[in-house]
């Protein structure tokens, strides 16, 4: 390997050479023939990096250690707080709607399909008492059954809606400048989605209301298998009272579209009123203060949560009688055994003989009275009371974190 050392390199004396191209007016300095005073003037601290920034005389580039602290102090924490707030609030809402509320949904459905029941559970106190007895007798899993199948049904619904909207001109969402044609197309898309998801919804309903005493441990995809089996007429044998799927299309689509219309209308109305109130309320704190930042972030997230909460509550309450009819038609002929909702210690079979939606409505009104459509209504009170409590706790925690940030 050849050396890269210059031929005339003689240690520090190499600095004594003069380059002809750059020697005009500048003489090279040598350590060998320089005095100590010259060395002190010539050997100084390294100059600042040229071109790094425009420096004046005696200016220095800030040290590397101080740069991160200045950058951190200059960066506002609002963006990180917004991300944390959005994730935390969304997670709390998802947990409340799909996990914490599931025992109330299970008990409500059992009450709706139990035509034997003498106690209608219109009050939340009686509902809580029987739910406690069921949990004490069958274990904590008794009121959490079928939760996986509900997620499967939600996934099938979202996937079907996306596929149909991509393959057809039906709009998946309505713009601000909508017209009647777009509204009709959007509702047709929703109706087709409910028709496709209907057999899987029926299988999920059976998993949620069937008693834990005689129930096996189904897999999370058994809902899909049972739904496809019901479409093709295969799978678990059913009785002759099982209604064909085309008889279930009208109540299923009617309930789904009405629920969507009511919830969407209430949500937009409540969101408009909340934002109008927040924009019209006077600001007592000075701009840029901590309280103003907290209030602005709360106004950005919680109106949507409150609007969604009010929309779901109104839709579930208004459509409770129709939901009772729908669940009784779906469960008929499936040889399902449910818990006795009067006491919570026994099981009962479902042996109804409805011929259709109109016959079911007339039979409930004739045999159980008008309040028979509201069996299990107390569980809705418990469900949305828990939901409101979680929202309030989340708001308090979030406000505390923002004030201490």
Swiss-Prot record:
Q: How does it sit in the membrane?
A: Multi-pass membrane protein
InterPro entries for the chain: Mitochondrial_sb/sol_carrier (IPR018108), Mt_carrier_dom_sf (IPR023395), SLC25A46 (IPR039158)
Q: What do the Gene Ontology cellular component annotations say?
A: mitochondrial outer membrane; neuron projection
Where is it located?
A: Mitochondrion outer membrane
The processes (GO biological process) annotated in the record are: axon development; mitochondrial fission; mitochondrial membrane fission; neuron projection development
Alphabetical UniProt keywords = Membrane, Mitochondrion, Mitochondrion outer membrane, Repeat, Transmembrane, Transmembrane helix, Transport
Q: Which Pfam families match?
A: Mito_carr
The record's PANTHER family line, in alphabetical order, gives: MITOCHONDRIAL OUTER MEMBRANE PROTEIN SLC25A46, TB1 PROTEIN-RELATED
What's this protein's family per the entry?
A: Belongs to the mitochondrial carrier (TC 2.A.29) family.
What is this protein identified as?
Mitochondrial outer membrane protein SLC25A46
């Amino acid at each position: 390997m050849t050396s890269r050392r210059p031929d005339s390199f003689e240690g520090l004396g190499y600095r004594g050479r003069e380059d002809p191209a750059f020697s005009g007016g500048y003489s090279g300095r040598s350590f060998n023939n320089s005095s100590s005073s010259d060395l002190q003037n010539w050997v100084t601290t390294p100059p600042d990096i040229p071109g790094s920034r425009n420096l004046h005389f005696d200016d220095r580039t800030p040290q590397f250690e101080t740069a991160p602290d200045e950058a951190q102090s200059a960066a506002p924490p609002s963006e990180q707080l917004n991300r944390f707030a959005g994730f935390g609030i969304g997670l709390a809402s998802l947990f409340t709607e799909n996990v914490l509320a599931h025992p109330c949904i299970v008990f409500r459905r059992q009450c709706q399909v139990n035509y034997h029941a003498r106690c209608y559970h219109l009050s939340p106190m009686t509902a809580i008492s029987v739910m406690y007895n069921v949990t004490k007798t069958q274990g904590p899993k008794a009121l959490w059954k079928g939760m996986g199948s509900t997620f499967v049904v939600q996934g099938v619904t979202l996937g079907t809606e996306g596929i149909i909207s991509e393959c057809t001109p039906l709009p998946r969402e309505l713009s601000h400048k909508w017209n009647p044609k777009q509204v009709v197309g959007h509702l047709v898309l929703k109706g087709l989605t409910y028709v496709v998801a209907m057999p899987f919804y029926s299988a999920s309903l059976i998993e949620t209301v069937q008693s834990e005493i005689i129930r096996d441990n189904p897999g999370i995809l058994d809902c899909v298998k049972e739904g496809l089996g019901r479409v093709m007429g295969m799978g678990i044998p059913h009785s002759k009272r099982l209604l064909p799927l085309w008889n279930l299309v009208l109540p299923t689509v009617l309930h789904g579209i009405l629920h969507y219309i009511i919830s969407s209308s209430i949500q937009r109305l409540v969101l408009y009123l909340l934002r109008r109130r927040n924009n019209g309320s006077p600001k007592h704190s000075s701009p840029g203060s901590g309280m103003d930042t907290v209030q602005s972030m709360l106004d950005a997230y919680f109106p949507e949560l409150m609007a969604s909460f009010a929309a779901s509550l109104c839709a579930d309450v208004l459509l409770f009688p129709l939901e009772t009819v729908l669940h009784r038609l779906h469960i008929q002929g499936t040889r399902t055994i449910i818990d006795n909702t009067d006491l919570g210690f026994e099981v009962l079979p479902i042996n109804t003989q409805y011929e259709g939606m109109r016959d079911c409505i007339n039979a409930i009104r004739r045999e159980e009275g008008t309040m028979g459509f509201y069996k299990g209504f107390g569980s809705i009170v418990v469900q949305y009371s828990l939901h409101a409590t979680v929202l309030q706790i989340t708001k308090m925690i979030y406000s505390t974190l923002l004030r201490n940030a």
